[in-house]
Amino acid sequence: MVFPVEAIVGLVTFTFLFYFLWTKKSQKPSKPLPPKIPGGWPVIGHLFYFDDDGDDRPLARKLGDLADKYGPVFTFRLGLPLVLVVSSYEAIKDCFSTNDAIFSNRPAFLYGEYLGYNNAMLFLANYGSYWRKNRKLIIQEVLSASRLEKFKHVRFARIQTSIKNLYTRIDGNSSTINLTDWLEELNFGLIVKMIAGKNYESGKGDEQVERFKKAFKDFMILSMEFVLWDAFPIPLFKWVDFQGHVKAMKRTFKDIDSVFQNWLEEHIKKREKIMEVGTEGNEQDFIDVVLSKMSNEYLGEGYSRDTVIKATVFSLVLDAADTVALHINWGMALLINNQNALKKAQEEIDTKVGKDRWVEESDIKDLVYLQAIVKEVLRLYPPGPLLVPHENVEDCVVSGYHIPKGTRLFANVMKLQRDPKLWSNPDKFNPERFIARDIDFHGQHYEYIPFGSGRRSCPGMTYALQVEHLTMAHLIQGFNYRTPTDEPLDMKEGAGITIRKVNPVKVIITPRLAPELY
């Protein structure tokens, strides 16, 4: 059933008029509040401000334009919650250095409850004991440098298999390859192999994984949908489910959870057999690792062991299968449109590695220009252009402004990393800027935080960088590229919270190496 905007506005206004009057604070803060963008309505605020405005760019772009108009620190309301948007070096540093602990909470979103194992997924969990233990498990056991080193043969083998598959698609000099689809298949198959030990290839075999892949796409859509409860968190909008989102989330979660549960049960049975013969310690994938390190009940935090394992697995799939593929896709599009940079990267690999073998992970440290390319792509197209929203647990001060407790924080990383005060020719693809500039990914250089900063920075950064460097190195080393029309690729960005390329990367490729290497 579709409800008109007027009916929703009327219902919300009636429901919350008394609530607003009753909860309104009378005490004025000692410091000024940040600028608030105009156009908000009573009670609902700016809920429909960004809808049907004729602007189909990503939200980060729209908020960047507002920063140009109202400054790098401003607010608006999405229903009841106040949203703070920051995009300057100074404000970002205030949030993730001075106020890092204060901004370490997550806002409550309905999808976290119904799709995110009741917020057991690490990136959705509030800051506290559970979050600390789960993050420690992931960083020290699952995604540690030593653990990832043990699995490097899996990454190399999967990328090699996918490269050979790409080679078989070449039909003369005129066949067009959809590189975007290929990257999605590669990254999805790679993370499924590393997490569950499954060999997945699209359209071949595992019906269960195919069902999960569809449910995963539904998750991505549902997690970005506007849900009334997120703006007005009262039980009414959960119980009545005006928009049908709760029903859709429950259905999608059932499909996702059934796959994870089957994987988990398979691993538990396998582990029991291993323990019977006394060969414990030979972990083959991430589920093996988590099972070996986690107690039966998750340390009294209210989640069962199985729930935490499935939530952890889901977090890893979400990060690896989606954001990594998205970033490599932008990177290859930039290189194809900048053939001089592509040729320079090819020459570096030819010189340092040669053309009689493929690039390996141990070579990456010597490929300085490749590293600069990855950094530059992350600068222009950060995987989370607004990061995951934060929420402050107490009043604080950002850039001299009073920020009330419970404010949601959007850090506009895309705007920050294209700030002309910090970057020369900020919209130009120029990997050379990172040759002369000593800057890393760890979030301590507040002009460059593609993986976030502070306590809530991305724990999967090391894995993502390993896959991105190795995949791009293979694609650069193995093939030449041109577009079917010999015109530059369209770089149009899609609407929404993430930055997705509207049109896939479709190119004609020709091999650069000897046939036996494919």
Swiss-Prot record:
<dbReference type="InterPro" id="IPR050651">
    <property type="entry name" value="Plant_Cytochrome_P450_Monoox"/>
</dbReference>
<dbReference type="InterPro" id="IPR036396">
    <property type="entry name" value="Cyt_P450_sf"/>
</dbReference>
<keyword id="KW-0017">Alkaloid metabolism</keyword>
<comment type="pathway">
    <text>Alkaloid biosynthesis; nicotine biosynthesis.</text>
</comment>
<keyword id="KW-0503">Monooxygenase</keyword>
<dbReference type="GO" id="GO:0016020">
    <property type="term" value="C:membrane"/>
</dbReference>
<dbReference type="GO" id="GO:0042179">
    <property type="term" value="P:nicotine biosynthetic process"/>
</dbReference>
<dbReference type="GO" id="GO:0020037">
    <property type="term" value="F:heme binding"/>
</dbReference>
<feature type="transmembrane region" description="Helical">
    <location>
        <begin position="2"/>
        <end position="22"/>
    </location>
</feature>
<dbReference type="InterPro" id="IPR002401">
    <property type="entry name" value="Cyt_P450_E_grp-I"/>
</dbReference>
<keyword id="KW-0408">Iron</keyword>
<feature type="cross-link" description="Glycyl lysine isopeptide (Lys-Gly) (interchain with G-Cter in ubiquitin)">
    <location>
        <position position="254"/>
    </location>
</feature>
<feature type="binding site" description="axial binding residue">
    <location>
        <position position="458"/>
    </location>
    <ligand>
        <name>heme</name>
    </ligand>
</feature>
<keyword id="KW-1017">Isopeptide bond</keyword>
<keyword id="KW-0560">Oxidoreductase</keyword>
<comment type="similarity">
    <text>Belongs to the cytochrome P450 family. CYP82E2 subfamily.</text>
</comment>
<dbReference type="GO" id="GO:0005506">
    <property type="term" value="F:iron ion binding"/>
</dbReference>
<dbReference type="GO" id="GO:0009820">
    <property type="term" value="P:alkaloid metabolic process"/>
</dbReference>
<comment type="function">
    <text>Involved in the biosynthesis of pyridine alkaloid natural products, leading mainly to the production of anabasine, anatabine, nicotine and nornicotine, effective deterrents against herbivores with antiparasitic and pesticide properties (neurotoxins); nornicotine serves as the precursor in the synthesis of the carcinogen compound N'-nitrosonornicotine (NNN). Catalyzes the demethylation of nicotine to form nornicotine.</text>
</comment>
<keyword id="KW-0832">Ubl conjugation</keyword>
<dbReference type="InterPro" id="IPR001128">
    <property type="entry name" value="Cyt_P450"/>
</dbReference>
<dbReference type="Pfam" id="PF00067">
    <property type="entry name" value="p450"/>
</dbReference>
<dbReference type="InterPro" id="IPR017972">
    <property type="entry name" value="Cyt_P450_CS"/>
</dbReference>
<keyword id="KW-0479">Metal-binding</keyword>
<protein>
    <recommendedName>
        <fullName>Nicotine N-demethylase CYP82E3</fullName>
        <ecNumber>1.14.14.-</ecNumber>
    </recommendedName>
</protein>
<dbReference type="GO" id="GO:0004497">
    <property type="term" value="F:monooxygenase activity"/>
</dbReference>
<dbReference type="GO" id="GO:0016705">
    <property type="term" value="F:oxidoreductase activity, acting on paired donors, with incorporation or reduction of molecular oxygen"/>
</dbReference>
<keyword id="KW-0812">Transmembrane</keyword>
<keyword id="KW-0472">Membrane</keyword>
<keyword id="KW-1133">Transmembrane helix</keyword>
<keyword id="KW-0349">Heme</keyword>
